[in-house]
Amino acid sequence: MSRLDYPAFDCDNHYYEALDAFTRHVPKAMQSRCVQWAEIDGRKRLLVGGRINRFIPNPTFNPVSKPGALDAYFRGKVAGGDMRAMFGELDPISPAYRDRDARIALMAQQGLEGAMFFPTLAVGMEESLRFDVPALCAAFSAFNRWLLEDWGFAYQGKIFAAPYFTLADPEWAAKEADWAIANGVKVIVMRTSPAINPAGGTR
């Protein structure tokens, strides 16, 4: 691989959410309708809207696949198959996947000047909560406040984490945008699909 003679800026970087990403700031009255954790058959399970959610096979992300595990697959160089097998040997989660200072140190090793950071688990939660728009908005209000605390919207001018927006409730989205702008947001993330309506359909 050729090397750049200047630091790169990565527009598609990701983190793995902390276990309390959706729970730290959610109102107590909404907890059972949003995102919770439960111990079931000795395993930590994610409950979304009171149901086991399987969007991510192991939403604790510990252990997790090695970086680039699916590179050959996404480049069309190998056929698909059993996804668990394709992930290969798993590693304990790295501090750099959840701690912004550890990530900045890693970025320096990688030659990155800065990066936009996007969710992993959170991108599947809008679909999971589409039939309960108040819970959907409460969940992402909580998530975005966790994101600001743990990663920051423009941390040290290097980490630009994107809060998640849904248009299921446009009034909520407008207020959330005002809050995000007041906290220095530079980039947001939204689902690439029609907006959900309060009945769970689309606008």
What are these regions (language model features)?
Residues 1-203:
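Helix-coil boundary/capping segments in enzymes
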